[in-house]
């Protein structure tokens, strides 16, 4: 059995998870244990492409065509966070990562941050949710038990 990649929304949350679950070794931009690889975003890493940035093959548009609701929204990396995105993309593509665990904040923005990363990476692994009500070690351990 491979490892699960846990993606938190921010580095402080990843650090709290590593401490609460124990057994992690800090590498450059992530933590690793026999069961898990643990890393984080730093808030939003990707954003929707503006219409003029959309690929031409999807067709040109003008304001006369509005409203336009495309079947697919293209994403682009946010420049200042590109290095962190690359860390996560490499982790997702690791051969030993066989599932992804969303440990981003439980609200809409946290879910969106995680889903954009998964979409951009074209990840095929199954996804699980680490739902954390608080950041206490006990709450994190309970959350892991219910993934």
PLM regions and their residue ranges:
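Intrinsically disordered, low-complexity regulatory segments
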Residues: 1-144
């Amino acid at each position: 059995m491979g490892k699960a990649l846990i993606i938190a929304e921010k580095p402080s949350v990843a650090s709290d998870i590593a401490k609460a679950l124990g057994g992690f070794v800090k590498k450059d931009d992530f933590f690793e244990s026999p069961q898990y690889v643990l890393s984080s975003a730093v808030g939003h890493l990707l954003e929707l492409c503006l219409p003029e940035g959309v690929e031409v093959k999807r067709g040109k548009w003008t304001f006369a065509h509005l409203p336009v609701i495309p079947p697919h929204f293209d994403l682009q990396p946010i420049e200042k966070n590109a290095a962190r995105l690359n860390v996560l993309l490499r982790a997702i593509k690791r051969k030993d990562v066989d599932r992804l665990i969303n440990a981003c904040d439980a609200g809409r923005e946290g879910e969106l941050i995680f889903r954009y990363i998964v979409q951009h990476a074209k990840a095929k692994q199954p996804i699980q949710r680490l739902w954390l009500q608080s950041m206490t070690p006990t709450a994190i351990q309970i959350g892991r038990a219910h993934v």
